[in-house]
UniProtKB/Swiss-Prot annotation:
Record PTM: Lys-40 is trimethylated or acetylated; other modifications may also exist.
GO biological process, alphabetically ordered: translation
Keyword Ribosomal protein: yes
Stated family: Belongs to the universal ribosomal protein uL11 family.
Organism encoding this protein: Rhodopseudomonas palustris (strain ATCC BAA-98 / CGA009)
Protein name: Large ribosomal subunit protein uL11
Sorted UniProt keywords: Methylation, Ribonucleoprotein, Ribosomal protein, RNA-binding, rRNA-binding
Classification via InterPro entries: Ribosomal_uL11, Ribosomal_uL11_bac-typ, Ribosomal_uL11_C, Ribosomal_uL11_C_sf, Ribosomal_uL11_CS, Ribosomal_uL11_N, Ribosomal_uL11_N_sf
Membrane-crossing residue ranges in chain numbering: none
Length: 142
């Protein structure tokens, strides 16, 4: 028989930098989970990732206080900022442009994010990436 799920917890943790300090420690501790067990498992799985890349993680919490976690791909804004070589998006998207990305970069980001997006084709994923780029104040060229 399957374990009874008592809840889910969504966090965004830097790759290889999970530690018991806030915000991870209190979020897991409130639910009675072993904080160090999560930190060690997460850091082991994110060793191959670039340091401090934000990794969204969904933790499934079971009634016996055990857990499993599923890692997602980094946020689209992270990839777009890297592609445009900027620190942050525009404060006034649509008026001020913070940078630009090419359609080749958009395709590359769409292919990386494909498994987390709710779309069937790369072209529809590219349209989602282009929309995110515009909302950040980035110009899409090409």
């Amino acid at each position: 028989m399957a374990k009874k799920v008592t809840g889910y917890l969504k966090l965004q943790v830097p790759a290889g930098a999970a530690n018991p300090s806030p915000p991870i420690g209190p979020a897991l501790g409130q639910r009675g989970l072993n904080i160090m067990e999560f930190c060690k498992a997460f850091n082991a799985q994110t060793q191959k990732e670039e340091k401090n890349t934000p990794i969204p993680v969904v933790i499934t919490i079971y009634a016996d206080r055990s857990f499993t976690f599923e890692m997602k791909t980094p946020p689209m804004s992270y990839f777009l900022k890297q592609a445009a070589k900027i620190q942050s998006g525009s404060k006034l998207p649509g008026r001020d442009f913070a940078g630009k990305v090419t359609s080749a970069q958009v395709r590359e980001i769409a292919e990386k994010k494909m498994k987390d997006l709710n779309c069937d084709t790369v072209e529809s994923a590219m349209r989602m990436v282009e929309g995110s780029a515009r909302s950040m104040g980035l110009r899409v060229e090409g």
